[in-house]
């Protein structure tokens, strides 16, 4: 059966579910993708990601051009107008097509009586575009981030906060991890070149390759066979710092979707790995990743605060704790994070991280290594967290990463580099 859903109305519904209902775009988008033809999936994704990336600008424009907000059952139209603005500002969709398709979206969401309103607002924007954009360039909304997050970044990074915000507003590069059990990185780069694509090795992470141009995974040499995995360069730093060895008992805590679990097994194929995550639904992706790569690990559902429930009294040679966090280092990959997080979440997350650290530390053998990692750029979850942990944990010592005053290594997002990420390598005395 031919799929003929209006893309613009689907994008508006997706954004509404994220902003109004607090749902993650990664949960909202896949079922909507099933409603459109394959050739239209990329545009639907671009509209959803793009509107969420620039949401504060689009909201600002609506407030300038409409006397009162759309509410109640008409609220989806509010987001449909945003989709129209985004196309006119940021895509190569011809303006006449952007207008026509967006206006027609009102029919799909059963608001045909509002077609004239949508058309009028979008045409008014076209007429006033230059004036409006000049005014927007000096407004508080120009950073495309919620005010609370801008303030936190300014406080934490007085000289770098604008760089972080600019990086967050960019499209991310596509990083891959070459499976060293199949190929050397240089060998796989040769296969990539034979396939007509170009990639660049990361200077610090030995398995990481950045594609010159993002590509679908089925086009990558040996993806189905497990030769390569999509994983950001900074995320690959976790296994690099962990330095797993064959024969060791290793715990990967907060493991879903399994990218770090499989990286550990690529580095140390004969390690005994236990992968644990609290989210049973996301654990299915750990199984999928292990299956594609032909690897074996023990996978369990469990809460990191209560290790006795999922590992008894077992101790480990190495532990990777990729702690639950604000994800403020991966906003360019997941722009919905800006609108799903709240200022109050940060203290709650820091408390949860501390509880997991304290609970899992006794499960590390003396002389063992624990790598604490987050995809956050906020000090409360990173350096401050590790500083206070070291103060209250006499048998913990910092190794390789930072100093007691400035513990850990903080990667900031930017350009063609990896995402924002924090690592602290701790040794049990």
Curated annotation (Swiss-Prot):
Compositional bias, Polar residues, is annotated for 400-412
TM ranges? none
Give the InterPro entries listed for this entry.
MeTrfase_RsmB-F_NOP2_cat, MeTrfase_RsmB-F_NOP2_dom, NusB-like_sf, NusB_RsmB_TIM44, RCMT, rRNA_ssu_MeTfrase_B, rRNA_ssu_MeTfrase_B_ent, RsmB-like_ferredoxin
Q: Can you tell me which residues bind S-adenosyl-L-methionine? A: 254-260, 277, 303, 322
One function term, GO molecular function aspect: rRNA (cytosine-C5-)-methyltransferase activity
Main function: Specifically methylates the cytosine at position 967 (m5C967) of 16S rRNA.
List, alphabetically, the NCBIfam families matched.
PRK10901.1, PRK14902.1, rsmB
In which family does this protein belong, per the annotation? Belongs to the class I-like SAM-binding methyltransferase superfamily. RsmB/NOP family.
Write down what this protein is called.
Ribosomal RNA small subunit methyltransferase B
* Protein species of origin: Salmonella typhimurium (strain LT2 / SGSC1412 / ATCC 700720)
> What is the phylogenetic placement of the source species in the record?
Bacteria, Pseudomonadati, Pseudomonadota, Gammaproteobacteria, Enterobacterales
């Amino acid at each position: 059966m031919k799929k003929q859903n209006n893309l613009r109305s689907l994008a508006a519904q997706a954004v509404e579910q994220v902003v109004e209902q607090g749902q993650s775009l990664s949960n909202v988008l896949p079922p909507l993708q099933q409603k459109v033809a394959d050739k239209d999936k990329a545009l639907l994704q671009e509209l959803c990601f793009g509107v969420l990336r620039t949401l504060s600008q689009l909201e600002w424009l609506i407030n300038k051009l409409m006397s009162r907000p759309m509410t109640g059952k008409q609220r989806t139209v509010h987001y449909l107008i945003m989709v129209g603005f985004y196309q006119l500002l940021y895509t190569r969709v011809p303006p006449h097509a952007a207008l026509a398709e967006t206006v027609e979206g009102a029919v799909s969401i059963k608001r045909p009586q509002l077609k004239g309103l949508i058309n009028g607002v979008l045409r008014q924007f076209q007429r006033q575009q230059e004036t409006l954009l000049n005014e927007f360039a000096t407004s508080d909304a120009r950073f495309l981030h919620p005010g609370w997050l801008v303030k936190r970044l300014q406080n934490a990074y007085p000289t770098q906060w604008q760089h972080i915000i600019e990086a967050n507003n960019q499209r991310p590069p596509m990083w891959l991890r070459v499976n060293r059990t199949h190929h050397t990185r240089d060998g796989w780069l040769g296969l990539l070149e034979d396939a007509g694509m170009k990639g660049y090795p990361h200077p610090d992470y030995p398995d990481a390759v950045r594609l010159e141009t993002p590509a679908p995974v089925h086009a990558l040499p040996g993806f189905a066979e497990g030769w390569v995995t999509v994983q950001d360069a900074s995320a690959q730093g976790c296994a690099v710092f962990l330095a797993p060895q064959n024969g060791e008992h290793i715990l990967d805590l907060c493991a879903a979707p399994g990218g770090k679990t499989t990286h550990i097994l690529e580095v140390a194929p004969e390690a005994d790995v236990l992968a644990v995550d609290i989210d049973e639904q996301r654990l299915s992706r750990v199984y999928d990743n292990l299956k594609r790569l032909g690897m074996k690990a023990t996978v369990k559902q469990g809460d990191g605060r209560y290790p006795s429930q999922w590992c008894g009294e077992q101790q480990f040679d190495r532990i990777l704790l990729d702690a639950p966090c604000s994800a403020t280092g991966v906003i360019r990959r997941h722009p919905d994070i800006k609108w799903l997080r709240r200022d109050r979440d940060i203290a709650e997350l820091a408390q949860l991280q501390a509880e997991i650290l304290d609970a899992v530390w006794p499960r590390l053998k003396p002389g063992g290594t624990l790598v604490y990692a987050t995809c956050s750029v906020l000090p409360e979850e990173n350096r401050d967290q590790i500083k206070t942990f070291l103060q209250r944990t006499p048998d913990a010592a910092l190794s390789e990463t930072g100093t007691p005053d400035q513990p850990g290594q903080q990667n900031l997002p930017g350009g063609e580099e990896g995402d924002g990420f924090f690592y602290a390598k701790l040794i049990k005395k």
